[in-house]
């Protein structure tokens, strides 16, 4: 029996507890951890973030398993075409035009880029397990699997995902940049929640998330390039068109989704229902 299964008697309460754990793990002293491995001021934060988020991902995976969500009935990994708009959004986050034109460049060695790629995967794994594999199904369990309920579950889980990025203020991030990050993190969270709902592929969501982070943060972290050079007019126009297309595509997909498929993400098995009936809380 899963040790934390009893928490699913109150899905919103369970979601709140998991969210508090996620916030706490987000606040781990990544830079200090990184200094245990290297004195390089450029590499230490990357190494620390990679280690802390990898450990956090394992912790969240443990919670996911113990809540009976990791082995919940999954929809077949199909209709991968539904992930194509998300993949385009993720790839477009890289400053391709600026890199080709030479107005932006990656100046770090290949080893640093490889470490940064691992960091992006670790961050994505932690956040996808926490917000898509745990919080989102718990909210589906609470609200239901109808169109309006699915919409509410996507919005609430993604809003919590976006608000978590407010913690960056404590590490010295600018208010404007943090507000922008909260906004686009909410939108990315909505997109990934719908992808997860439709495909049932947690690994796919992790990959999309990692590609998005890698493309968007590689130059600012390990390269050089002015903001206006990276976000030049062609890039802004392409991004705007892709954003509108993705919003319309995933909103239609969400509202037209099969309720049975949504239910498979949060439905308790017969064994789990029997176990819950024996638990008195």
Residue ranges and their predicted role:
Residues 11-65, 78-100, 110, 114-119, ...:
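Alpha-helical transmembrane segments in multi-pass membrane proteins
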Residues 13-17, 83, 87, 151-156, ...:
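Hydrophobic alpha-helical transmembrane segments
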Residues 47-53, 210-281:
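C-terminal membrane module of polytopic membrane proteins
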């Amino acid at each position: 029996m899963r040790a934390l299964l009893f928490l699913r008697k109150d899905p919103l309460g369970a979601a709140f507890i998991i969210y508090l754990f996620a916030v706490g793990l987000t606040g781990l002293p990544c830079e200090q951890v990184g200094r245990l491995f290297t004195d390089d001021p450029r590499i230490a934060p990357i190494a620390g973030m990679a280690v802390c988020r990898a450990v956090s991902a394992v912790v969240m995976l443990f919670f996911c398993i113990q809540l009976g969500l990791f082995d919940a009935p999954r929809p077949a990994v199909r209709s991968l075409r539904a992930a194509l708009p998300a993949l385009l959004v993720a790839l477009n986050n890289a400053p391709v035009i600026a890199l080709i034109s030479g107005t932006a460049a990656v100046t770090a060695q290949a080893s640093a880029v490889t470490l940064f790629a691992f960091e992006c995967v670790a961050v994505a794994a932690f956040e996808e397990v926490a917000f898509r594999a745990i919080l989102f199904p718990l909210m589906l369990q609470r609200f239901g699997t109808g169109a309006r309920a699915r919409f509410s579950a996507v919005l609430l889980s993604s809003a919590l995902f976006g608000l978590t990025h407010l913690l960056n203020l404590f590490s010295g991030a600018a208010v404007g940049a943090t507000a922008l990050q909260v906004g686009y993190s909410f939108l990315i969270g909505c997109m990934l929640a719908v992808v997860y709902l439709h495909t049932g592929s947690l690994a796919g969501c992790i990959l999309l998330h990692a590609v998005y982070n890698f493309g968007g943060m590689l130059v600012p972290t390990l390269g050089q390039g002015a903001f206006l050079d990276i976000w030049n007019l062609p890039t802004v126009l392409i991004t705007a068109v892709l954003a509108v297309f993705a919003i319309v595509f995933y909103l239609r997909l969400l509202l037209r989704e099969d309720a049975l498929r949504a239910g498979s993400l949060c439905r308790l098995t017969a064994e789990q229902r029997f176990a819950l009936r024996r638990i008195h809380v």
